[in-house]
Amino acid sequence: MANEEVILLDFWPSMFGMRLRIALAEKEIKYEYKEEDLRNKSPLLLQMNPIHKKIPVLIHNGKPICESIIAVEYIEEVWKDKAPNLLPSDPYDRAQARFWADYIDKKLYDFGRKLWTTKGEEQEAAKKDFIECLKVLEGALGDKPYFGGESFGFVDIALIGYYSWFYAYETFGNFSTEAECPKFVAWAKRCMQRESVAKSLPDQPKVLEFVKVLRQKFGLE
């Protein structure tokens, strides 16, 4: 597929954008990265995602693919001949991978956000929900090195971006992920050893500083 144009509209702390960075890196797809200012969204972003007006947006030969999980599947389908395979070949296993990616999107983001945007009883409830969610994911991981088994893949890509936010979650939620969910942290550290992940995720202290600025804007500091 020569002369392809691949552009990623993204914002550096976005765990959703990190999914596409990792997937593109795993497939060794060259692309142009365009950092968005979400307070002053570019005409290109508004043109390419007129419905949600959100990042990330993958633009392939002028055509936009929105929503990060959909875009990761698109990357797998378009470049299926490039190793590694991001989704399992077995239909049942693919369905299970999609189930867990959906679970992550429906549960983890909101619980994590509440850890740094709330206080008191609401924050304590969010912490309980967040840790319970991680324990459910630990159960799905089991004793496997990755969610799909021996190989890094779809569910790992869907989840690992959140890890860059964990220092912020722990700081404001006042808990230790390693103490509560050691198997999850071991999995995350295993993922971080992959070049595609290490280069796609920002440093946790940098994300913490970003969250502190947001908290000040929201009047939480």
Swiss-Prot record:
All copies of domain GST C-terminal, residue ranges: 90-214
Binding site for glutathione: S14, K41, I55, E67, S68
GO CC annotation terms, alphabetical: cytoplasm
Keyword annotations: Auxin signaling pathway, Transferase
GO biological process: one example: glutathione metabolic process
UniProt-recorded Gene Ontology molecular function terms: glutathione transferase activity
EC number: 2.5.1.18
GST N-terminal domain location: 4-83
Gene3D superfamilies to which the protein is assigned, alphabetical: 1.20.1050.10, Glutaredoxin
Reaction catalysis annotation: RX + glutathione = an S-substituted glutathione + a halide anion + H(+)
Induction of its expression: By auxin.
InterPro entries the record matches: Glutathione-S-Trfase_C-like (IPR010987), Glutathione-S-Trfase_C_sf (IPR036282), Glutathione_S-Trfase_N (IPR004045), GST_C (IPR004046), GST_C_Tau (IPR045074), Omega/Tau-like (IPR045073), Thioredoxin-like_sf (IPR036249)
Stored Pfam families: GST_C (PF00043), GST_N (PF02798)
Claim: Amino-acid biosynthesis is one of the keywords in the record: no
Tissue specificity of this protein: Root tip-specific expression.
Family to which this protein belongs: Belongs to the GST superfamily. HSP26 family.
PANTHER family: GLUTATHIONE S-TRANSFERASE PARC-RELATED, GLUTATHIONE S-TRANSFERASE, GST, SUPERFAMILY, GST DOMAIN CONTAINING
Name assigned to this protein: Probable glutathione S-transferase
Native organism: Nicotiana tabacum
